[in-house]
A protein has these predicted regions:
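Residue-level signal for alpha-helix termini/capping positions
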Residues: 19, 46-47, 103, 107
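Short His-centered aromatic/hydrophobic patch
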Residues: 38
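Acyl-donor (CoA/ACP) binding surface of acyl/acetyltransferases
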Residues: 2, 6-11, 57-151
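Residues within well-ordered alpha-helical secondary structure of globular protein domains
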Residues: 16-20, 44, 133
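A short helix-loop-beta-strand connector motif used in the catalytic cores of GNAT acetyltransferases and
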Residues: 43-55
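Short, hydrophobic secondary-structure boundary micro-motifs
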Residues: 25-27, 54, 117
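Flexible, glycine- and charge-enriched loops at secondary-structure boundaries
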Residues: 31, 35, 88
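A short, well-structured alpha-helix characteristic of acyl/acetyltransferase catalytic modules
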Residues: 4-32
């Protein structure tokens, strides 16, 4: 299992995962996203120097994606697991692997991330468990849970 940087070749897989009913149910934005809008957004994220986007591959199969948007030394995590790959512990693994990447862990001089955060809908129990099992501190505000970890 490994993380690699995302490319435009991954855009349609990520769109398919994002528009999956279960993914949408657990997302803050639950509407389906059009291919046209997604491709524009995906390219913009790939070109953004304050965004790091990765694909998780397990036995040469694309199994999920994880993105970190960096603002003022804080990296906000957003991830999803491909529908056919859920239930295999990959949510915990994708976060754990992200923390070991040199761009995130601080071994890359361009990266100044001091803290990672993830926001989770209260109903998304699986994602909450993934953050907790990776040592994140949970804060709750209404129906949103925030998970924080200094790195």
């Amino acid at each position: 299992m490994q993380l690699r940087r995302a490319t435009m070749d991954d855009a349609l897989d990520v769109l398919s995962w994002r528009n999956d009913e279960t993914t949408r149910m657990n997302s803050f934005t639950q509407d389906e996203i059009s291919q046209e809008n997604h491709l524009k957004w995906f390219k913009k994220k790939l070109d953004d120097e304050n965004c790091l986007m990765y694909i998780l591959e397990d036995k040469n199969v694309k199994a999920g994606s994880i993105r970190v948007d960096i603002t003022d030394e804080v990296g906000e995590i957003s991830y999803m697991i491909a529908p056919g790959e859920r239930g295999k512990g990959l949510g915990k693994a994708i976060i754990e692997q992200l923390e070991g990447i040199s761009e995130i862990a601080g071994n890359d001089s361009k990266c100044q991330i001091r803290c990672l955060v993830g926001f989770v809908n209260e109903a998304n129990i699986a994602s909450s468990k993934c953050f907790k099992s990776n040592g994140y501190t949970e804060l709750i505000a209404g129906d949103i849970k925030c998970y924080i970890k200094n790195i």
